[in-house]
From Swiss-Prot:
Keyword vocabulary terms for this entry: Cytoplasm, Methyltransferase, rRNA processing, S-adenosyl-L-methionine, Transferase
The protein's name: Ribosomal RNA large subunit methyltransferase H
Subunit structure: Homodimer.
Top-level taxon of the source organism: Bacteria
Length: 144
């Protein structure tokens, strides 16, 4: 896997300090990671804002409880398949993402069968992106 070239588009702001600290730590380790925040609004307006934030060269990957659950190693392999394409992972707000947005993509990702607060989902995703990069590059962070 190439060095990180991912984007996270997330609805809402991170308010918890410990999550902000965790995000800052992983962003230092993933210098190519971009996080874009979209304002909380009605679901159709959020979907509009998410689409407006997307670049034409990005592949949209919504996070959803209906999405595909992968092990960390499987996630790393999946990311490798996308090669140089830039992936834009999307995390919805308290009400999730619109069905139209989720259904317009080729791949949805689930971080857990459980429902997670969107702030925590953001931190978990960033950690898994870092883990995937170290798995692919043979780093010592991931221990099987």
């Amino acid at each position: 896997m190439r060095n990180c070239a991912f984007r996270i588009i997330a609805v809402g702001k991170v308010r918890k300090g410990w999550i902000q600290d965790g995000l800052a730590m992983y962003q230092k380790r993933l210098p190519g990671l971009i996080i874009t925040e979209v304002r909380d609004a009605s679901m159709p307006r959020e979907a509009e804002a998410i689409r407006a934030a997307l670049n034409s060269n990005e592949v949209l990957v919504p996070l959803s409880e209906e999405g595909e659950a992968l092990t960390s190693v499987s996630f790393a392999k999946r990311l490798e398949k996308y090669g140089s394409q830039r992936l834009a992972f999307v995390i919805g707000g308290a009400d999730g993402l619109s069905a139209e947005l989720k259904n317009s993509t080729q791949w949805q990702l689930s971080l857990s069968a459980m429902t997670l607060p969107h702030e925590l989902a953001r931190l978990l995703l960033v950690e898994q992106l870092y883990r995937a990069q170290t798995i692919t590059q043979g780093g010592k962070y991931h221990r099987s």
